[in-house]
Amino acid sequence: MSEEAAYQEDTAVQNTPADALSPVESDSNSALSTPSNKAERDDMKDFDENHEESNNYVEIPKKPASAYVTVSICCLMVAFGGFVFGWDTGTISGFVAQTDFIRRFGMKHHDGTYYLSKVRTGLMVSIINIGCAIGGIILAKLGDMYGRKMGLIVVVVIYIIGIIIQIASINKWYQYFIGRIISGLGVGGIAVLSPMLISEVSPKHIRGTLVSCYQLMITLGIFLGYCTNYGTKTYTNSVQWRVPLGLGFAWALFMIGGMTFVPESPRYLVEVGKIEEAKRSIALSNKVSADDPAVMAEVEVVQATVEAEKLAGNASWGEIFSTKTKVFQRLIMGAMIQSLQQLTGDNYFFYYGTTVFTAVGLSDSFETSIVLGIVNFASTFVGIFLVERYGRRRCLLWGAASMTACMVVFASVGVTRLWPNGKKNGSSKGAGNCMIVFTCFYLFCFATTWAPIPFVVNSETFPLRVKSKCMAIAQACNWIWGFLIGFFTPFISNAIDFYYGYVFMGCLVFSYFYVFFFVPETKGLTLEEVNTLWEEGVLPWKSPSWVPPNKRGTDYNADDLMHDDQPFYKKMFGKK
């Protein structure tokens, strides 16, 4: 039993919804960093076992869903940062096909027409990902220095500065390019701090759902971005692209205003000595009085956590490479999950959807993009339910398998049936419609599984002591792959057309096996329990059977989950 669990029992607190907050997790982090406490933890464990029957546990009660409306609205406001990024993704896909944008930032043919070269298109679309990667690593530290809430406000302001530079661009493509980099810095900070703050203020039994709302907001932003492009496409001047950019400015201001009503992370408040505010934050999230004994006990646990962290000193970058505490293994897993989210191929459709569906012969590819945006947004609601109903691991496995099937059909039809008489002799309408249908199936599978769940997994996995650093690195991997896919897609598509889909198919097959062998199930666990699961070295494919130490019966054998003398593949293919 961890030091925190022993402390909780000694203070008559066990398994409260507030355990889902990162501050609770941090005590386990301090235990990771101060192994000299082991003897003390063992003594406390013996004490608890001798007094377990006499303890009267105080817990913050689980309430009906209607009781969590306030915390849900607050988390949606934090998740609105995802809307900002989704808006950019949805609008840029249309900008590169709009006449005024091409005339201002493109190059001129000998016949007087304008065009965007593949290099310039790739850079203007994907460079925001480089800004995001840098911003996530550098600006996420603001959340540790000034609080998650103030850190979010600062990075949104940086995003606004980038938007202003883009709007002010007249005919210099590199000015627009610089503006997108600066906006990317802000979006990168948002992508780390938004899920982090949501996970720290959410009750444990709805944490996965509320963190998934970040992805829901991304899909809403993409959809409304598509709709705005459709509404401005008939204009022949800069209204085509400046109005969507101006609305992006307005959305960012709206988020800043909404953040004033969001509670700060209780852990940060305790760390800076604002105990009463920490009580109010926990009480607001769990719909109880700030004077409730369970809230007061929870704050005491957080205080003990903060003191333990201070004794251990500041976390260094070197700690993220610790294999003894399994931090490095978690970092590799988080980085892989975020990378594989991009390698599923979703941004192939989101960044270049308008261009792709022009290629399949559709007369109005902007309308098709709107349809895809609706499918993506509506499907994410299903994903919010699935993540808590079936768990993170099972959803990722089924998502990878179903997306593989959809991508095989999409690519095969594009390669063999789209141009029956050659690429220059027109496309088959039936084949094009088939590709659209399976693209919708693909987006449904993506939106319900691989779109929201990587954010959930990363927000739950890392010890609080190194959480901001690890989340920033993992998210940076996502952005870097986003840049590579966004930049090279025009070249690859031009060279191999829809054979490109087979590349994503291979990545999806790899994703399935990676999740099976390396991603544990964390559904229904507090952040501290997730930490214990990793410390115990539970095999990922056995993790759904894992039980936290304070809930185990006498017949529970934890060793059975830590090794597999005859795994399924040996049983299937080995000698009988």
UniProtKB/Swiss-Prot annotation:
Residues 1-56 are annotated as: Disordered. One of its GO terms (cellular component) is plasma membrane. Keywords: Cell membrane, Glycoprotein, Isopeptide bond, Membrane, Repeat, Sugar transport, Transmembrane, Transmembrane helix, Transport, Ubl conjugation. InterPro entries: MFS_dom, MFS_sugar_transport-like, MFS_Sugar_Transporters, MFS_trans_sf, Sugar/inositol_transpt, Sugar_transporter_CS. It is found in: Cell membrane. Coiled coil: none annotated. Residues 1-66, 144-149, 202-207, 264-346, 388-394, 459-475, 519-576 are cytoplasmic. The keyword Transport applies. NCBIfam families: SP. Belongs to the major facilitator superfamily. Sugar transporter (TC 2.A.1.1) family. This is Low-affinity glucose transporter HXT4. It comes from Saccharomyces cerevisiae (strain JAY291). The lineage of its organism: Eukaryota, Fungi, Dikarya, Ascomycota, Saccharomycotina. The gene is HXT4.
